[in-house]
Amino acid sequence: ALDNETNEIVGESIVMTSHDDELGVAAGVIECFQNCLSENGIAPEDVVFIAHSTTQATNALIEGDVAKVGILAMGGGGISGMLAKSQSKVGDILLDSGRYIHTTHTYLKSKQVNEETVREHVQKLVDDGATVIAASEAFGVDSIEHEMLVKAEADRRGLMASVASDISKLYGLTRRTRTAAINGSILPKMMNTANCTESAVRSAGVDVPLMIMRGDGGVMDINEMKKRPVLTMLSGPAASVMGALMYLRASNGIYFEVGGTTTNIGVIKNGRPGVEYASVGGHDTYVNSLDVKVQGVAGGSMVRAGNKQILDVGPRSAHIAGLGYAVYTPPEEIEEPELEFFSPK
């Protein structure tokens, strides 16, 4: 907790990540927030602003905890239609961990778009195993009407939907479609976290807006995050960089943030962090983020072994296997350790 006028730290609280709780990591956020108020004598009515940074989007992509996305692409006919169909068929998207965001694809000519044809194509995607729908139309940034019609059909079915031209207003069908697919893949996990966190803040008696840190260092409200969670990629390191700029007043430096699942590395030069489009699995997106490199190895990383040798380290953390982190273990409990093998859940 910071004093809004002096930027002085007036309270803090640290809790373990609550992956096994029925509320997921949101339970830890709830506990940390409530502890920070009670342990530091802060009254709910004294809170004027809440900025929540989350590594949920980053961790979901690092660990492959993503949903299968059905892409309903739209565009012209003839040669231009062939090009649009090819550009919007992004295939399975490789993640840095070696896992994939699996996608399925169907194409509908823009002149044929209506409620009936959209319903048929969404059904085809569902039959192919999609649990989230991504709508993307060639030149959709000029008119979002058709993409919103797809979203309306997804809403009618109780499916989550990602609208490409609602995420980015930049041209480039392939990159815009890929961004929408990535956004859709993390929607289920992020929606649950957002709802639980918002409920917890309200139950604590705090009525001020709950703002979520974006990956570019800005903030957005909770409702925007529910539509565009992909913008929170690198939210955690963005918050740390902003903290370094504001509290430490660092003007030049190399920044490391070591968490449980990932380590983030960034540079502050002349008082400014670098900003660029985020890349997922080597593929560019239309998501502005701080120029931070994310490595899937950190304080809780598990060592992977096989064939009598160490194969790799990470990206899965010890908590995924139901284990604690060694850093929190009393030294006397790990004297003369014996080697044991565990598997992530």
Question: Where are the predicted features?
Answer:
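N-terminally biased helix-coil "hinge/interface" segments that flank
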Residues: 1-345
